[in-house]
Amino acid sequence: MVRPVMTDLMDDLAYQIHEYLLEEATPFKGGYLVLIPITDIVKKFQKNHRTINRRISALKDEGLLEPLIKKTYSTLYWVKDPDEENG
C-alpha cells in the first residue's frame, strides 16, 4: 500500500494555527513573539502532534514562522503577520 503524499500543507488548519499564534503572541520590535508548548496547540485544535508539527513546518517553509529558541517542550517563535508586511 502506498501512502498519499500531502504536497500542500498550507491548508485551513495551518492558517488557523498561524492566527492562533498571532493571538497569543506579544508585540516586540515591529513583530510578534510567542513562547508556546506544542501540546497547547495540540489541545486547542484537537489534532495529533504529527499533524500539528507538519503544519508548523509548512508555516516555517512559507516564512510566516521562525523558531528562535527551541527547548524540549516549547519553542519561542517569531510570528510574521503578512497583513502588516503588505499594508
List each language-model region with its residue ranges.
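Short intrinsically disordered terminal tails
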Residues: M1-V2, M6, K43, D83-G87
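A short alpha-helical element within helix-turn-helix/winged-helix DNA-binding domains
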Residues: Y32-F45
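Short, cationic-aromatic polyanion-contact patches
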Residues: M10, K70-G87
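A short, conserved structural fragment
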Residues: K60-K70
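Short helix->loop/beta-hairpin flanking segments within DNA-binding domains
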Residues: T7-L35
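Residues in the recognition helix of alpha-helical DNA-binding motifs
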Residues: R55
